């Protein structure tokens, strides 16, 4: 493992996946700062560019206010110096308060999110990632309300080379996940990744269903650890944040998977997610391949998004 906690392959994937974002609106932010004198007009323009990059108005104002304070405290004079400070500030704002808890027996990851955001493929990509990390992974087809969900997940499980536990349409999701955790424990698997229903038409039902699943996990394996990752589509930008806020009213997520980051020239919602939802981004999707889901690190993200190379101080 190399820089920022991941290897060259992951670093290259992040670099390639952020190409549109780096050369798009974030490129405009750098152009705004580079060669500029630090004054109120610059701060106003930077705030506007951050909003255009999908950071959102509230977060953009907060970032610029903090940048202004840091610039004044350190006596910085040039836009290039301010850009370096912005890099550090963004990394600080996105840093998680704790690592994922995956030391249970088994470690269980529930994956939640509305249909169409890349939830099923993210599950398979998680399975592939953790398998490559040496974990023995089993999948649970917990979305029993959508006819094609289990079949789709089965195809991806085959690609990832991991076993899948499923039941018929309309089966109790908590029972499916209970059986999976029991099976994993009996067969020596140390991780279960579970799909859940991708709908949000009734918050009370969803909340009750996820609470029941959580109880079933602990009943099946008292020593299990439990993480709940919410999948969001980066292309939808601020709409993803609004959608996530609604989902989080019904579900206690512990982290975010941000998919399709390679498909947007904005990408500012990565920053907004942590600020608006108080949830860390754990993984980002930077392509369609099964190995194109990579662990997110603020330092790695900022390094590729706002490179220092070639700047004069």
Q: What is the meaning of each model-derived region?
A:
Residues 1-2, 313:
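Short, low-complexity, intrinsically disordered N-terminal peptides in bacterial proteins
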Residues 152, 172-187, 201-312:
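Conserved catalytic-core segment of NTP-binding enzymes
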Residues 15-16, 20-144, 149-194:
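Primarily NTPase-proximal linker/entry elements flanking Walker-type ATP/GTP-binding cores
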Residues 5-7, 26, 302:
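Compositionally biased, low-structure terminal segments
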Residues 2-3, 76:
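C-terminal effector/interaction modules appended to NTPase cores
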Residues 2, 9-13:
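Switch/coupling subdomain of P-loop NTPase systems
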Residues 197-199:
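Short glycine-rich anion-binding loops that position phosphate/pyrophosphate groups of nucleotides
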Residues 4, 17, 251:
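Surface-exposed, interaction-prone regions with an acidic/low-complexity signature
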């Amino acid at each position: 493992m190399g820089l920022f906690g991941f290897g060259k392959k992951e670093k290259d994937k992040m670099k390639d996946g952020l190409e549109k974002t780096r050369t798009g609106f974030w490129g405009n932010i750098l152009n705004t700062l580079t060669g500029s004198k630090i004054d109120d007009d610059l701060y106003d323009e930077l705030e506007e560019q951050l909003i255009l990059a999908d950071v959102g108005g509230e977060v953009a104002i907060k970032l610029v206010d903090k940048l202004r304070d840091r610039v004044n405290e350190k006596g910085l004079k040039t836009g290039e110096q301010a850009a370096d400070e912005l890099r550090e500030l963004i990394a600080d704002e996105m840093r998680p308060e704790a690592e994922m808890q995956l030391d249970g027996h088994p470690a269980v990851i529930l994956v939640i999110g509305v249909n169409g955001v890349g939830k099923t493929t993210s599950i398979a990509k998680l399975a592939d990632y953790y398998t490559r990390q040496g974990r023995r992974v089993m999948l649970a087809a917990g979305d029993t309300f959508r006819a094609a969900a289990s079949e789709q997940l089965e195809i991806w499980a085959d690609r990832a080379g991991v076993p899948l536990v499923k039941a018929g349409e309309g089966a109790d999701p908590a029972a499916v996940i209970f059986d999976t955790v029991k099976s994993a424990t009996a067969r020596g698997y140390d991780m279960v990744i579970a799909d859940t229903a991708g709908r949000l038409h009734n918050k009370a039902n969803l909340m009750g269903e996820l609470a029941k699943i959580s109880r079933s996990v602990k009943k099946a394996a008292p020593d299990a650890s439990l993480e709940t990752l919410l999948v969001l589509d980066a292309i939808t930008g601020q709409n993803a944040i609004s959608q996530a806020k609604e989902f989080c009213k019904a579900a206690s997520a512990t982290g975010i998977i941000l998919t399709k980051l390679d498909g947007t020239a904005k990408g500012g919602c990565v920053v907004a997610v942590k600020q608006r939802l108080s949830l860390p981004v754990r993984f980002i999707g930077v392509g369609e391949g099964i190995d194109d889901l990579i662990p997110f690190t603020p330092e790695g993200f900022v390094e590729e998004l706002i490179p220092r190379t070639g700047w004069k101080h």
